[in-house]
Amino acid sequence: MDLATLRAQQIELASNVVREDRLNVDPPTIIGGADVGFEQGGEVTRAAMVLLKYPSLELLEYQVARIPTTMPYIPGFLSFREYPALLTAWEMLSRKPDLLFVDGHGISHPRRLGVASHFGMLVDVPTIGVAKKRLCGKFEPLSDEPGAVSPLMDKGEQLAWVWRSKARCNPLFVSTGHRVSIDTALGWVQRCTKGYRLPEPTRWADAVASGRPAFLRWQEIQG
């Protein structure tokens, strides 16, 4: 694995990330969510994608792709490991979302190319990174109140908003993926959060991928 080549690719791709709002449909009518996990000791990569209707946020469609993992886990290069399965799930969708939430980082990455940015550029769709852990940068401690927010800064540059979506829960790191500004990204994540820590698009993607009770109940209702 030639990390120098991958690092150079990241820097080149990151220079082409669009950090301004360029949504084709605004406001979006279909919002997607994506979540990636690994099975069989990391041998299989699993990507789940969901489509939600906006503004109702009802689940319209889901797809789950499982493919052999092609790259080992290397910190800072996770997007290269995850995007093949995401691309497979993306191609399985009957229609494409106007905006995609990705469980992971966008530009809040040491080389400004997390999976939300990498995948957004691959398929040229507006994406938002919604991460549960900090990868780089610093931020001022948040109050315990829901809605508390602080900028994530690195080398004088704001990379994300750190936002506490729910009381007594760790905050989320919301960043530009591609074709969505950092402030617009936070606004959409706030609008799509309904009482849980995660916004509905990535919450549903996780529920589908993991077979959580909310998804099983949805399947029962659908018959």
Swiss-Prot record:
Keywords: Cytoplasm, DNA damage, DNA repair, Endonuclease, Hydrolase, Magnesium, Metal-binding, Nuclease
Marked site: Interaction with target DNA: Y73
Any one Gene Ontology BP term: DNA repair
Claim: DNA damage is one of the keywords in the record: yes
Compartments, record wording: Cytoplasm
Record's GO cellular component terms: cytoplasm
Top-level taxon in the UniProt lineage: Bacteria
Cofactor: Mg(2+)
Positions of Mg(2+) binding: D35, D103
Catalytic activity of the protein: Endonucleolytic cleavage at apurinic or apyrimidinic sites to products with a 5'-phosphate
Coiled-coil regions listed: none
InterPro entries for the chain: Endonuclease-V
Cleavable signal peptide: none
EC number(s) on file: 3.1.21.7
Top EC class, one word: hydrolase
Molecular function via GO: deoxyribonuclease V activity; magnesium ion binding; RNA endonuclease activity, producing 5'-phosphomonoesters; single-stranded RNA binding
Function: DNA repair enzyme involved in the repair of deaminated bases. Selectively cleaves double-stranded DNA at the second phosphodiester bond 3' to a deoxyinosine leaving behind the intact lesion on the nicked DNA.
Cross-referenced NCBIfam families: PRK11617.1 (NF008629)
PANTHER family: ENDONUCLEASE V (PTHR28511:SF1)
Family: Belongs to the endonuclease V family.
Name assigned to this protein: Endonuclease V
Organism listed in the record: Cronobacter sakazakii (strain ATCC BAA-894)
